[in-house]
Amino acid sequence: MSKRRYLVAIGGILLHLMIGSVYAWSVFTGPIAKQTGWALSSVTVAFSIAIFFLGMSAAFMGRLVERFGPRLTGTVAALLYGSGILLTGLAVQVESLPLLYIGYGVVGGLGLGAGYVTPVSTIIAWFPDKRGLATGMAIMGFGFAAMLTGPIAQNLIAGIGLVPTMYVLGTAYLLIMLTAAQVIRKPRPGEDRKSVV
């Protein structure tokens, strides 16, 4: 069996683990509203914006993955999503609701779409003999992310505060996603995906 294809799968799972943290947004809404004085409903709008831009960017990102390769689109996803979380921290720090919507909603949402689409078709291409397993691996990280991110974020908020937590998570997402993106690539023409190391 190919060691390379499992490395690609791990990279894809890591990408999805990072962007899947979007589903832990509810952990942040209360603390953000409390710290800034914004209405809870105003804070939750950021999530809706992010999901909207996830869908919008995913719609056109698939073609870019095919044209430019998953390494580039994964890198773009890392830069956008990591920056979006960092901008979220800045938005809370300076108490700017529009910046929250732009940072988390637009920038982060675009990163979500790029990060979601990037590994799916790539992992499936490496596992032509196990398409069901490949699909499961491709989206597994996205599903597990909220379960992992929620407790980590709660502990960080309790330990170092809300804004530093956003900066720590944004930096971690950026670095982990950048690293993961570098191992993701399409199989080369004629490459035996079951035996290549």
Segments the model singles out, each with a brief description of its role:
Residues 23, 51-59, 147:
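Residue-level signature of mid-helix packing/kink "hotspots" within the transmembrane helices
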Residues 2-24:
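Pair of pore-lining "gating" transmembrane helices in MFS-fold secondary transporters
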Residues 142-188:
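Helix-loop-helix hairpin linking two adjacent transmembrane segments in secondary transporters
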Residues 32, 113-127, 134-135:
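Intracellular juxtamembrane helix-capping segments at the cytosolic ends
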